Structures are given as structure tokens and as C-alpha cells.
Amino acid sequence: LTVKESIRVASDISGEPRIMLPSLYCTVFGTLTAMFYCRMVEMRPVRSMGAVKKGALRSYLIGIAVGIVLMSAITLLSVLFGVNSIAVRSGINFGMIALYFGGFLVQGMSEEFIFRGYLMNSVGGKHSAALAVGISALAFGLAHAANPGFNALALLNLVLFAVFASLYMLNSDNIW
């Protein structure tokens, strides 16, 4: 198998809910590992990863709202420019949608802790903020290389989003 064929097979398999849903929820172990490593190996408080207790729920909900606004804008722009269309379907499984939504919340939080909470702050503690943002943004983009449809434009968009998320975190000093 070539790398391209391997990625296609992995994408086909991982698209099945019985594989995808547990995979999304299991990313919480990446968060716990990053926290453990930060605390026990680097001897830094978890707070150094941007995990602020005060107002965490409010900040997290604001982050979700920002994400919904950004994704809605992308969707609407793609419809306006004829790239995608929106269709209403009957027989929607709202339970499955809720499971996926919860899974993507966990997976998104895990990516934040790994790439911005841990990696960006670890690099930033020894080097400039610009280098820390650049390294964590590029790592974030490359971590999605096995995603279906990944190409140079997808990498650029992921890196740009990661720069935005990094600057947002640096401005608020809060991962939530």
C-alpha cells in the first residue's frame, strides 16, 4: 500500500460511527497526558497551560459560540459562492448528532490543550511568542494530514486558524 492508499483506507474505516465516535471521545487521553507531562515531568502548574478555573465555563461557552459563528460563516460563504448547498432532510437522528457534537467538543478541547496549552506554552517559555505560535500552528496543521481532502490549501487554512486560536489564547491568557 502507498501512503495515499493507506490514508484512503484509514479515512473509509474511521468514517464509520462505531469507529469515529470512540475515537473522538478517546482524545481526552491526549489532554490528560499533556496535563500529566506538564505537571509531573516539567514541574509546571496546569495553570501554565492556560487552564484558568475562574470563569472557565463562561469562557468555554464563549469559545463554543465563536466556533459556531466561524463555522456558520464558512458554511454560508461556501453556499453563496456555489461550492456547497444546504438541503433539509427527513429522518434526522438527533441523538447521533448530539453524540458527534459532544465528541467534537472533547476532541477540540484536546487539540487546544495539546497544541496551544502544552506545545505553544512550552516553546514560548524558552523562545519568542512568534516562534511558539508558528511551531504550534504548523504542528496543528500537520496533525490533520491524514484527514480526507487534506492538501496545501487545507494546511494553509488549518495553520491560519491555529494562529488565530493561538493569538486568542495569548490575548486572554486562558485556554477556555
Annotate each predicted stretch with a short phrase:
Residues 71-72, 104, 128-145, 158-159:
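Small-polar-interrupted transmembrane alpha-helices in polytopic inner-membrane proteins
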Residues 154-176:
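Functionally important transmembrane alpha-helices
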Residues 36-45, 168-171:
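Structural signal for the C-terminal ends of transmembrane alpha-helices
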Residues 2-23, 44-110, 120-125:
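Juxtamembrane helix-loop-helix connectors linking adjacent transmembrane helices
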Residues 110-135, 167-174:
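Membrane-interface helix/loop boundary segments of multi-pass membrane proteins
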Residues 1, 26-36, 66, 70-74, 76, 105, 137-146, ...:
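Alpha-helical transmembrane segments of multipass membrane proteins
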Residues 83-90, 143-152:
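Membrane-interface helix caps and helix-loop-helix hairpins in membrane proteins
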